[in-house]
């Protein structure tokens, strides 16, 4: 189907694309299987639609859009927090959490995760870090380049930046201005 603009003498096509039981293997051998998608173009050349896929530990469903050479996938993903962070008595997470995920791919691939962590327990010798599952703690995790992952974590209890053995962990917001002045290539600051 299409649209003819007689003033511009231009035809714009509206197309539908369907993918059934497809798969992708990334350069790092990460497999995404059983991809089903329905995508539509519109007159501004944006591609959008819905998808479902199997990643190694779960099925995901979400939306997809492509515009100006940028691909954005949105979905909810489930993460076993026990496997995510375990620093012994200092900070241990437990529970299974659902995150809203946004994967953006243009010149690089980035991933943003957000959740209120309502299914996660924080256990720590430091009282300020403890959290019951019933307590909401709106948290955002940003991995700005998946090929060279660094983790920026931010919520009302703490903020952290983790890059290999470098970065920082800041409890509260008292040191926000000091953190902006630090160079994190020479160690991990607490």
Describe each region flagged by the PLM.
Residues 1, 9, 13, 19-112, ...:
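Interface amphipathic segments
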């Amino acid at each position: 189907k299409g649209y003819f603009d007689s003033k511009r003498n231009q035809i714009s096509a509206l197309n539908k694309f369907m993918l059934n039981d497809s798969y992708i293997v990334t350069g790092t051998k990460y497999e995404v299987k059983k991809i089903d998608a329905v995508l539509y173009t519109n007159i501004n050349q944006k591609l959008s639609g819905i998808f479902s896929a199997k990643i190694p530990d779960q099925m995901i469903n979400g939306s997809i859009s492509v515009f100006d050479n940028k691909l954005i996938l949105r979905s909810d993903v489930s993460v076993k927090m026990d496997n995510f962070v375990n620093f012994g008595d200092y900070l241990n997470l437990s529970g299974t959490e659902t995150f809203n995920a946004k994967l953006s791919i243009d010149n690089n691939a980035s991933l943003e995760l957000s959740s209120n962590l309502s299914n996660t327990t924080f256990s720590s010798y430091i009282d300020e870090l403890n959290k019951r599952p019933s307590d909401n703690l709106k948290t955002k995790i940003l991995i700005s380049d998946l090929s060279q992952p660094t983790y920026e974590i931010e919520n009302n209890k703490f903020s952290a930046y983790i890059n290999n053995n470098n970065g920082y962990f800041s409890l509260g917001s008292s040191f926000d201005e000091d953190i902006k002045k630090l160079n994190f290539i020479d160690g991990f600051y607490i």
